[in-house]
């Protein structure tokens, strides 16, 4: 049974779906990639797909992706996921993450972060703060479907440090996503933040109820206005008033300036001394942001580090994996850009 499922799973990557209207076909030969699939041709097709193409792919490949019985997403068969991750190991999960439903992808990453403990709490912050309210809700639903538990209860029971209150509130949040703000509320929140920061222990601010309330319930556009008001009122950036290693910093960057946050993560991921968590972020960031804000991230990376992001990936990655990531970056940029 397992062998049959594996053959189905791998064969599907050698199919050009009519609904996607891709003309290129995969070829098979002794010198080609895994199980005879022409990896280069496969990646050339996959990297062109927009979200609607990926959705069609999942819907048309019921041998791999099953419609969830409760929620509107397609999830990967567990046994097939293990096989695919093994067979596509050289791509460092890029192909698997790219084809997976975003809700499932985020849910599985959250689960992995919880298993790794404190060193991966930043990933939980990233998932909770850089997604829209509906995307985060979708990930929470997928988490329930995949693991028969809620992400909220797992964070509450498995995080035992001072980050627990903040992380539970972040993953539980459903923020207002509209464009309206209230000037009075902005000023009040600015004053409350400054008061909490000025009288509190910097290393304990993450437990401050007012700070946690504001950062986990207010809309992103409201928080951007609060950060601006803080700067104008007190003549300093709120980031300067926080502990250097504080999770609150990552929370604020993820909520208010994702391109700057992701640029920093990518810089860490491409350093020679990067640890496992940092290295994995290269795949994660490029794949999850390719259809969101990759143009902004690439421009911010270039501004901060004086090197085009695509060139940096060329320098540190290899083979088809490198080509896949570079193409995802370049397709988001204006023609003629590096």
What are these regions (language model features)?
Residues 2-9, 13-338:
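Structural signature for extended repeat/solenoid scaffolds and their inter-repeat hinge/linker regions
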